[in-house]
Each structure stands twice: as C-alpha cells, then as structure tokens.
Amino acid sequence: MVPHAILARGRDVCRRNGLLILSVLSVIVGCLLGFFLRTRRLSPQEISYFQFPGELLMRMLKMMILPLVVSSLMSGLASLDAKTSSRLGVLTVAYYLWTTFMAVIVGIFMVSIIHPGSAAQKETTEQSGKPIMSSADALLDLIRNMFPANLVEATFKQYRTKTTPVVKSPKVAPEEAPPRRILIYGVQEENGSHVQNFALDLTPPPEVVYKSEPGTSDGMNVLGIVFFSATMGIMLGRMGDSGAPLVSFCQCLNESVMKIVAVAVWYFPFGIVFLIAGKILEMDDPRAVGKKLGFYSVTVVCGLVLHGLFILPLLYFFITKKNPIVFIRGILQALLIALATSSSSATLPITFKCLLENNHIDRRIARFVLPVGATINMDGTALYEAVAAIFIAQVNNYELDFGQIITISITATAASIGAAGIPQAGLVTMVIVLTSVGLPTDDITLIIAVDWALDRFRTMINVLGDALAAGIMAHICRKDFARDTGTEKLLPCETKPVSLQEIVAAQQNGCVKSVAEASELTLGPTCPHHVPVQVEQDEELPAASLNHCTIQISELETNV
C-alpha cells in the first residue's frame, strides 16, 4: 500500500506541476547541450539554424505583448471607479519607486564591499570613441516616448535621438590660419651607412562636434502604449454605459489572449532548450571572460539574490502576513521563462497566467499592476546600473564622494524606469548614470561580454518584483475591491444562467430591485440576506405565439 500511495502521490505532483518540471529540465538540458556543442566549433550559420526553435518562442511571446497590455490596462481600469483606480495607481507607483531605490542601495552596498574593479583590466576596444547620446537627450527621449505622435508607429518603433559627428571648419581668413608645422628627424641604422628621415605633422586636427537629430529605433514603445491605455481605461470607466461596448471588447480580447497563452505554453520547454543553448554557443571564451569580469559578475548576482530572495519576500511577509515561499512557488513558471527570454514584457502573459490560476490574485488588480510593472518596475536593472557605474569608476581609479554616490542612486532609479522590458535595454540607460557623475561612457564596452548572462538574472528579479507587487496590492486594496464586488462587467464565460425561481427568490429577499439587476447575478459570493424561498409553480399559461411571450414576476409584467 505504501509504494502505491507514493506512486499515486508522484503522479499527482507531476500532473499538477508537469509544465514547471519540464521547464526546469529544459533549462538544465539547454545549458548542458550548449557547452557540449561548443566543442564542435559550429559556424555562425549553423548556430543560427540551431537557434530557430528558440527564435520561434521569442516571436510567440512578443506577438502577445501588444494585445495583452492594451486590453488588460483598458479593461482593468475601466472596471474600477475613480477613487479605487486612483488609490491603486498611487500605491502601485509609490511601491515600485521604493523597491527600485532599495535595489540601488543594495547594489551600491555590494560593490563597495566586494570592490570588483581592482581585479578587472581595462582594454581598448574597437567601439571606444563612438558617439553616445547625452544624459539630457536620454531623459527627454523618455518623456517624448510617453506621448507618441503616432500610435500605430508606437507599436513597432520608438523615438530616439541620434548623435552624428560634424567637422567644424574654422571661420578665419587664410592668412590667420595656424601655420602648418612639420618636424623632420632622422634615425641612423646600426652600421651607420644609411639615415632614414621621418616627418611628423604637428598641425592641430579639426574640431569635431556632435549634433543631435531626431530619429527612431526598432522596438515597441511600451511606455507610450501603457500611458495611452491607462488614460483610455480611466476615461472609459467614467463614461459609464456609453463606453461599455469597448470595455466588453477589451475584456474578450484579454480573455482570448490568455487562452492562446494556455495553449502555447506547452511549446515553451522545447523552445527554452534551444534558446539557452544558442546563447551559450555565441558566448566568448568563458575562461577569459571569467578572469576579467568574474568578480563583477559575482557582485551583481549576489546583489540580485539579496534583493530578490530576502528583501522583497520579507517586505511581502511584513505587509501581508503570508508565506512568500508559497507565493513564489506559484510563479516559478514565469521566472523560468524570464530566465530564458531575458524580457519582462515577453514574460507578461505567463505572469498573468500564474497569478490568476496559482496565486488567485484579483483579475482587476493583475490587469493594472503587471503591465505597469513590466514598464517601470526594473529593480534588477537599477541594481545592475548602480553596480556597473561604480565598477567603471573603480577600473579608472576614480574616487567617488558621498554626493556622487547619492547622484548615482537617484539617476539609476530614474533611468531604470525608462528601460523598456526588452533584452539589454539597461545598456542604453546606463549612459544617464555614467554622465551624471562624469564617468567615461566608452567604458560601457567593458561589461558587454557578460551582460547577456546577467540580463537574464536581473529580468527574473524584475518579474518577481512585479508579481509580489500584485500580491501586496491585492492585500492592501482588498477592502476597496470587496466594496466593488459585482460592479465589474464580467465576461460571458464568467457568468452562469439564472433561472426564474432564482430571480424571484432574490427579489423577495430584497437583494435586487429590478429584473435588469437580477440578470446581473453571477458566480460571485451570495447575498448575505439570501434565504431560500420556495416558489410555487405558476398555473399553466395559454400557448402564445413563438414571437411573443409574457413573463409575470412579482406583479411586474415584461413583454419579450
């Protein structure tokens, strides 16, 4: 009996957590397969063919980002009243800013203790000296992207200032131009039979200035779409019945996308194997990279572990008085997808699925908190930017005072908000942090070799922070949403047919006052005043035509 019980228990666990087990195995198999194939010396073309199943996984996830973000924000905010939505919005944004600032402090603390810059060696790379946009342009681009000029273009492009070098010609007369100085010197050979002359031109080079021009870059403008969808959802909620058709459309779109996710999720373990193995095949020599940037990588990973596995769960525990381990276990599938895809936006459909099905978070809260978090809550990115900035300062033997460290903490928090939920977006916003304290932006190339791997770990922390925020907001706002229970227009798949006897019983108990209100009865909690009422069968009415019937309900006559 005991072996049979154990076997039955094992089958039950596999049935309930089969997808999670497959995802864990796919990560392990992908790592082993990638390091094994490195010994085969595959060509770049062969590697691209090998990565094709993983590329399909990324395309499937990105395909669902736009409809999911738009439908969830618009339907979620439209279903809330103005007071509830404003309170939820203020609490969510304040929580995100606070946890992001805490992540920056953790990063500064870890990099100051480990001091990884002393073990790294600075090398001149081919990319040094390339023009990079200033911090002012980067901040202005964030604000511009919040208000896209073309919503259709915002679905596949975002605004980005382009910096081009321009040779500045001196505006002086030819006779006033600086003279051209040439220095000639000779080098005699060892036998003294021949003298080689060399000429050195000492004319000063022309002045080069960088000009900022408007431009675009490929990638969805997630910040602008989130801002527009949130505003549209709030306005639809205030329009009342006139906005109900569009709200119903958004609810149906959101539900259909989640059903697509439920089907596509079974392809993810297969795609993860090739996605991770392909990235390992593209990696440079691991020994050389580890020797140069090993301490830097350890610093970032330790900071992420401290913030993600200790600070955020403790914050969740103290606020909700619930076990964070149980909550995190419910979103393990989303964390594994974040590790594989390195994109918090691409992980958004899976995070929705885990919170609704495993952790039973209110659908209205998840619809608002998750899309906003995937856009502005970047705890892992903020920690990484703070560590990288101080690491570059240590490599250049640049001592940072207390004021500069405070500047780094503030700018890293602000810059991470604008980092779109796409792979390696932190490298772009890193410019803001470096220029704020006068560090050379060319040294970003020092950390590119390991950024692809660290990006996956910080994406996991970003997704974990979004999910825990949804759990905390569900606990804090539970009374507000308890008062609003029944006001949300649910989908047809979320309602049940109501019989005539139930309508009469509800009306006699005083739970509803009209037939129209009685038709809104759903699967929600029953009315506290409800008492089962025995409804007598009405006398058989004479047959009516198929196109007309009369229903009598408590002295109300309704023609249908």
From Swiss-Prot:
Keywords: Cell membrane, Glycoprotein, Membrane, Symport, Synapse, Transmembrane, Transmembrane helix, Transport. It is found in: Photoreceptor inner segment membrane; Synaptic cell membrane. It is a multi-pass membrane protein. GO terms for biological process: chloride transmembrane transport; dicarboxylic acid transport; L-glutamate transmembrane transport; monoatomic ion transport; neurotransmitter transport; neurotransmitter uptake. Interacts with the PDZ domains of DLG4. The gene is SLC1A7. Residues 1-16 are cytoplasmic. Belongs to the dicarboxylate/amino acid:cation symporter (DAACS) (TC 2.A.23) family. SLC1A7 subfamily. One of its GO terms (cellular component) is postsynapse. The chain crosses the membrane at residues 17-37, 60-80, 94-114, 217-237, 260-280, 300-320, 330-350, 372-392, 414-434, 457-477. This is Excitatory amino acid transporter 5. GO terms for molecular function: extracellularly glutamate-gated chloride channel activity; glutamate:sodium symporter activity; high-affinity L-glutamate transmembrane transporter activity; L-glutamate transmembrane transporter activity; neutral L-amino acid transmembrane transporter activity. Its main location: membrane. It comes from Homo sapiens. Expressed primarily in retina. Detectable in liver, heart, muscle and brain. It catalyses: K(+)(in) + L-glutamate(out) + 3 Na(+)(out) + H(+)(out) = K(+)(out) + L-glutamate(in) + 3 Na(+)(in) + H(+)(in); K(+)(in) + L-aspartate(out) + 3 Na(+)(out) + H(+)(out) = K(+)(out) + L-aspartate(in) + 3 Na(+)(in) + H(+)(in); D-aspartate(out) + K(+)(in) + 3 Na(+)(out) + H(+)(out) = D-aspartate(in) + K(+)(out) + 3 Na(+)(in) + H(+)(in). PROSITE patterns: NA_DICARBOXYL_SYMP_1, NA_DICARBOXYL_SYMP_2. Glycans are attached at residue 191. Sodium-dependent, high-affinity amino acid transporter that mediates the uptake of L-glutamate and also L-aspartate and D-aspartate. Functions as a symporter that transports one amino acid molecule together with two or three Na(+) ions and one proton, in parallel with the counter-transport of one K(+) ion. Acts primarily as an inhibitory glutamate-gated chloride channel being a major inhibitory presynaptic receptor at mammalian rod bipolar cell axon terminals. Glutamate binding gates a large Cl(-) conductance that mediates inhibition, affecting visual processing in the retina. Residues 115-216 are extracellular. The lineage of its organism: Eukaryota, Metazoa, Chordata, Craniata, Vertebrata. Changing residue 41 to C: In a colorectal cancer sample; somatic mutation. It comes from the Eukaryota.
